[in-house]
Amino acid sequence: MTVVDDIYELMTTKTTDESVDIEAEIDKFGESVKSLMRNEFSPETPRDDRKLRLSNIGRDDRFLWHHYNDTSSEEEIQGHTYVKFMYGHLIEEMLLFLCRMAGHTITDEQKVCEVEGITGHMDCKIDGVVTDIKSASPYGFKKFK
């Protein structure tokens, strides 16, 4: 079985392994969501966008050149886009909660990583496997086919 199968089984049966502390996991999930909302609605700390980040690895050279040389006029991010970002963060927290409830081990959440001088964060490791959690619309999934 896979993590996905285990989550579906959890949702169908509503039963967890004896080793899972249900109340502790619910509390942890609640604290994670509260932290997310605090970050969302606290004054923003400016970010240095001139630094190459791990999330840019694999991007087209032309894109990176234009990004770091500020050749485009920056569009203002609209409200619905901020909602999409928040939705993605909430989905990540919910999936990590469900993984824990299904008996999987989650470690290294948002761990700072450095590869050849480039810094980034991993989402987590699930059962020792580096995992990046993403949400996407049906349109977003089509581009990977």
Residue ranges of each PLM-predicted region?
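Metal-dependent nuclease catalytic cores that hydrolyze phosphodiester bonds in DNA/RNA
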Residues: M1-V130, S137-F144
